[in-house]
Amino acid sequence: MNKEFIPYEQALELKQLGFDEPCFAFYDESLYFPNNENQYGTFCNQKLDVPFCSAPLYQQVFRWFREKYNLDISINTVYSKYNEILSRKYSGVIDNEGVFTNVGFYDTYEEAELTCLKKLIEIVKSNTPKP
């Protein structure tokens, strides 16, 4: 189940970008799942001190980027055949208001997913004015 949550490093970067959606778990460098939802509720970055941060799911983060920044991703399966050997790779593509960026080809879906997430963070950081 841990692979459904984004890594700690990216969760910290998202906290800096203003991600504050309710999450079912949080990081204190390692992933922490509360035992009783009624006792702990959900976690938002606004309520968590440093170094704690919420632990969002990939789908949550991708929805946030889509709704807040109009950035969308797709991960496509690409097959190739060489010398009668069929291979499968995963290609991540970011749609930035009609400008498509291919982030590469990866052996696993999860690698493509993480690379897309890192690229989304990079895009938003590069377009955010510094204080």
What are these regions (language model features)?
Residues 1-27:
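Short, extreme N-terminal segment that most often corresponds to the first beta-strand
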Residues 12, 16, 20, 30-107, ...:
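N-terminal segment of the canonical double-stranded RNA-binding domain
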Residues 119:
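Cys/His-rich zinc-coordinating "finger/knuckle" motifs
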